[in-house]
């Protein structure tokens, strides 16, 4: 009887998929090559890139909600939505004299599950079957002791093999009794007590990739358990499952519905390795981020199913129009700190050697930030974190790109001469530029502003080197940079206003962000006439206060809690964690 009921559920899910307007792969092919389910927080700048499968097609948009406009030159819907709610608008594609229209669903809410990509640690690369209560607690301790949480690293996630050999007699999922002798509730409570989020792993099949029990057919009983354990993120793999895209959608939708019914607010992280193009349907299936490739390995060039950094660039470079707030393309785990000591991360890269070079680790990190990919560290927490690696993890101005409230993935600008150039729009109006030298020798890169739609060749820009955290000379029309082999340079550009200082005042003594008598106090001496963008968020990225000001002292009332305060001015962003 249960089997028949489950089949009925699957059929109903398939019908719901059709009603959502997500056509199966073989019927009603879309004329669009971009997201049609998009999200924003109220009062935060929004951007939706509109792209057609035929790049020469004419595009237009109608029915936009208040606060949004259509920028035909850049082919983006942009603006600031003011009120929460569900809205729709139409995209019209005209080619060869024929026009087709497609609906966009636009959800505006201050309670989105994943407004900015998560930053944390995932157990698989270094730990695999050894994941345990002690290791999870050790990671939480390490992140707080080294002040990594101040930079945004605030999630500890268990991958495969946390499971007992079998479920309880009543079907409930159980953790391994030796490695988690007290169950998972105390583990979750410990992580939460450190001001961090707790994540777990499952599979949309009967068995996980490592052979533990999966969630297929038991979605609700598992979701209820995750709610009891206060799990914030569930990574859901797709091993041992049918290959069809329609089936994947149905199975992930079943898990998303179960998580919603369980009531804790657990976020679904889809992991089917990009084989069924989840960026085209993951949001409709209830996912908030999705892997776009096979597992990343600790090497520059991968082999077989192993992704090196070159393969990550290949897989991410053409899907930026499918990303935005609450819907992120995930480039997989970061290898910073591994140095060839990982387990699966060293496979398919020859199984030998020291891993990547420090320039290559920095390149991987910079690109993940330009792409606003979720960032899951994967080093062994039981080993000493090298100073160079810790410096990467505390590169606050680079991280600010990843955590930008508009959630945009950088667009590919050029791959000429083995120099891979990306450009990224930021919420405060700045534009970030990166160049990765994939050749074997040093090169000079030239950014041509006429190729970057967010820049104006007639305007002058304040330029900041984000790795060096230094202001450079102003730029107009072009920007040149020397780039070592396999290195990545990252710059942030802000339009220069007449009479405004070029040097960022956030670098000088006197700047401070602190809690005082129940108020947040931001002191910015020497910034008269300079425009500052201030965003106050909780640790998950929900915007609690937002303002643009030319004032030098700002006070805000906030309830008790942990917050990140991001202050942007003259191409520099400073993040401060405060406890009220």
Please describe what each predicted stretch is.
Residues 218, 267-376:
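Glycan-recognition surfaces
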Residues 30-57:
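Solvent-exposed, low-complexity, repeat-rich "mucin-like" stalks and linkers
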Residues 60-76, 472, 541-544:
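Low-complexity "stalk/linker" and mucin-like segments enriched in Ser/Thr/Pro/Ala/Gly
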Residues 475-499:
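C-terminal beta-strand-rich structural cap/linker in extracellular carbohydrate-active enzymes
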Residues 125, 137-139, 143-245:
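Aromatic-lined carbohydrate-binding/catalytic grooves of carbohydrate-active enzymes
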Residues 504-580:
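C-terminal outer-membrane/trafficking sorting elements
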Residues 362, 368-371, 376-378, 414-455, ...:
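Carbohydrate-binding surface patches
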Residues 76-84:
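Extracellular/luminal low-complexity segments enriched in Ser/Thr/Pro
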């Amino acid at each position: 009887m249960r089997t028949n009921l489950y089949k009925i559920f699957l059929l109903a899910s398939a019908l719901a998929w059709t009603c959502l307007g997500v056509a199966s792969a073989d019927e009603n092919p879309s004329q669009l090559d971009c997201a049609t389910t998009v999200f924003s927080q109220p009062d935060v700048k929004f951007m939706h890139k509109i792209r057609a499968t035929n790049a020469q097609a004419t595009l237009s948009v109608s029915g936009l909600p208040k606060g949004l406009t259509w920028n035909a030159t850049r082919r983006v819907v942009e603006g600031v939505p003011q009120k929460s709610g569900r809205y729709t608008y139409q995209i019209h594609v005209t080619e060869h004299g024929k026009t087709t229209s497609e609906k966009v669903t636009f959800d505006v809410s201050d309670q989105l599950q994943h407004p900015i990509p998560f930053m944390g640690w995932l157990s698989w690369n270094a730990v695999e079957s050894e994941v345990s209560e002690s290791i999870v607690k050790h990671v939480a301790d390490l992140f707080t002791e080294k002040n990594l949480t101040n930079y945004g690293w605030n999630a500890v996630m268990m991958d495969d093999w946390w499971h007992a050999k079998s479920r309880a007699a009543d079907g409930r999922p159980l953790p391994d009794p030796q490695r988690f002798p007290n169950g998972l509730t105390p583990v979750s409570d410990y992580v939460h007590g450190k001001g961090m989020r707790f994540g777990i792993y499952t599979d949309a099949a009967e068995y996980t990739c490592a052979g533990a029990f999966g969630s297929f057919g038991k979605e609700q009983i598992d979701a209820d358990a995750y709610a009891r354990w206060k799990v914030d993120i569930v990574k859901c793999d797709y091993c041992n499952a049918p290959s069809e895209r329609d089936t994947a959608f149905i199975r992930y939708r079943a898990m998303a519905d179960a998580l919603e019914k369980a009531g804790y607010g657990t976020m679904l992280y889809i992991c089917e390795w990009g084989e069924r193009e989840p960026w085209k349907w993951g949001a409709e299936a209830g996912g908030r981020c999705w892997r776009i490739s096979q597992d990343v390995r600790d090497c520059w060039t991968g082999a077989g199913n192993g992704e090196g950094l070159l393969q990550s660039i290949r897989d991410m470079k053409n899907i930026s129009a499918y990303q935005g707030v609450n819907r992120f393309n995930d480039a997989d785990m970061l290898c910073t700190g591994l140095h060839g000591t990982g387990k699966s991360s060293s496979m398919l890269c020859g199984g030998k050697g020291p891993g990547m070079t420090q320039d290559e680790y920095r390149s991987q990190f910079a690109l993940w930030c330009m792409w606003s990919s979720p960032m899951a560290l994967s080093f062994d927490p039981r080993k000493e974190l090298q100073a160079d690696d810790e410096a990467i993890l505390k590169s606050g101005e680079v991280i600010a790109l990843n955590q930008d409230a508009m959630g945009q993935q950088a667009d590919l600008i050029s791959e000429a001469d083995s120099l891979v150039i990306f450009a990224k729009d930021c919420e405060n109006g700045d534009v970030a530029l990166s160049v990765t030298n994939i050749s074997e020798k040093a090169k000079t890169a030239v950014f041509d502003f006429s190729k970057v739609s967010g820049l104006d060749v007639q305007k002058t820009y304040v330029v900041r080197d984000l790795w060096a955290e230094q202001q450079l000379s102003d730029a107009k029309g072009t920007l040149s940079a020397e780039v070592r082999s396999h290195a990545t340079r990252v710059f942030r550009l802000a339009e220069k206003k007449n009479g405004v200082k070029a040097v960022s005042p956030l670098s000088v003594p006197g700047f401070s962000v602190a809690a005082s008598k129940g108020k947040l106090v931001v002191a910015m001496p020497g910034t008269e006439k300079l425009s500052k963008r201030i965003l106050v968020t909780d640790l998950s990225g929900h915007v609690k206060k937002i303002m643009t000001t030319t004032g030098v002292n700002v006070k805000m009332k906030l309830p008790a809690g942990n917050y990140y305060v991001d202050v942007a001015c003259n191409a520099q962003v400073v993040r401060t964690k405060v406890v009220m």
